[in-house]
A protein has these predicted regions:
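Short loop segments and helix-boundary regions at transmembrane helix junctions
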Residues: 31-35, 83-128, 169-172, 232, ...
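Hydrophobic alpha-helical transmembrane segments of polytopic membrane proteins
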Residues: 81, 236-259, 282-287, 294
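Cytosolic-side transmembrane-helix boundaries in multi-pass membrane proteins
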Residues: 109, 187-191, 195-198, 270-303
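Inter-helical junctions in multi-pass inner-membrane proteins, predominant
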Residues: 2-17, 169-174, 203-241, 266-274
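Single transmembrane alpha-helix segments in multi-pass membrane proteins
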Residues: 4-53, 91-101, 105, 245-249
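Extracellular/periplasmic helix-loop junction at the C-terminal end of a transmembrane helix
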Residues: 115-143, 268-275, 295-303
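Helix-loop-helix "hairpin" substructures at the membrane interface of multi-pass membrane proteins
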Residues: 14, 147-225, 249-255
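Membrane-embedded helix boundary and interhelical linker motif in transport proteins
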Residues: 39-87
Length: 303
């Protein structure tokens, strides 16, 4: 029983990262029907941004430690990563959208942006792995034989709060209703006076900011960074979003946790080399049975 409970909490933490990243994929796809394959590398870049922000703040403000350092780093990282997402949208996606480019070209562009971010970080910062600094003091609670850390709780709570906040924004706010309206008919929406480009810009900013939250928490939890760290976790988060039902916020959230649970419990019972194989086979079976994912809805498209 202890073994199960301990791995249950480990799976919650690991699934939280997948969920937070998957929500970013879901947000952009839900509005534009665009899979932003660079999202995993935006997550990676946010970790580097947080790393250098901590170094800068620690060097220039020696008394800044603990929670204040974490909050300032988090807010600044979210803002800078949001600017990165907006810049990518303005420079890469918006021109293609204005020209009515085929979706294949948009997908290729997204992949190229990811490669640029990876190799740009590689060229500037080198291939050597960097160790993410300790920002918050880690508290360990032993509940019987089960060990839970304060960081683990922070990660899980952050994922839940982000999900709830995103649901509120999309379902209850005027901007969220505009986002949903664009997903239904982006050509008719300008006739209703809704500023399409402004809504799209906000969508990319919000999705990138979510990646930043995941990035800084991931760096604190697994403090080894490299330029390619976002590639695999980004692809897995995308698959989790698809399994949950791409474009559905609840589906992306649950899909991330599902993948986290599969990976942790496969590793608990089998050699770690089987983790990806078994995980992807299970996810493939799920998609074979229900191609739209758990919460996705089949839609007809006129061609």
């Amino acid at each position: 029983m202890t073994f199960f409970i301990q791995n249950f909490f480990n799976a919650l933490q690991w699934g939280s990262f997948y969920s937070m990243i998957a929500l970013g994929y879901c947000l952009v796809y839900g509005v534009l029907r665009l899979v932003n394959f660079a999202h995993g590398d935006i997550f990676m870049t946010s970790t580097y941004i947080a790393f250098f922000l901590v170094a800068f703040l620690s060097a220039h403000f020696a008394g800044l430690t603990g929670v204040p350092l974490f909050v300032i780093t988090l807010v600044c990282t979210m803002a800078l990563t949001a600017l990165l997402g907006v810049g990518i949208e303005k420079l890469a996606y918006k021109p293609l959208r204005a020209k009515g480019a085929n979706r294949l070209y948009v997908v290729i562009t997204a992949l190229m942006i990811g490669f640029i971010l990876e190799n740009g970080n590689l060229a500037v910062f080198g291939a050597s792995a960097r160790s993410f600094p300790d920002i918050l003091a880690k508290h360990v609670w032993n509940i019987g034989p089960v060990t839970i850390t304060s960081l683990k709780v922070l990660v899980i709570v952050s994922a839940i709060v982000i999900f709830a906040l995103l649901q509120f924004i999309v379902q209850k706010t005027t901007l969220g209703m505009s986002m949903r309206a664009i997903s239904y008919d982006k050509f008719a929406i300008p006739l209703m006076g809704i500023p399409v480009n402004t809504v799209i810009t906000f969508t990319f900013a919000l999705g990138s900011a979510l990646a930043a939250v995941a990035g800084i928490l991931f760096g604190m939890s697994y403090p080894v960074m490299d330029p390619y760290m976002g590639m695999i976790i980004g692809w897995k988060a995308f698959i989790a979003a698809v399994v949950g039902g791409i474009g559905d916020i609840k589906g992306a959230f649950i899909g991330g946790f599902l993948l986290g649970f599969i990976e942790i419990f496969v590793t608990a019972f089998l050699p770690s080399s089987y983790k990806d194989l078994v995980s992807f086979v299970i996810l493939l079976v799920i998609l074979t049975i229900k191609p739209t994912g758990f919460f996705g809805v089949a839609k007809s498209t006129k061609i």
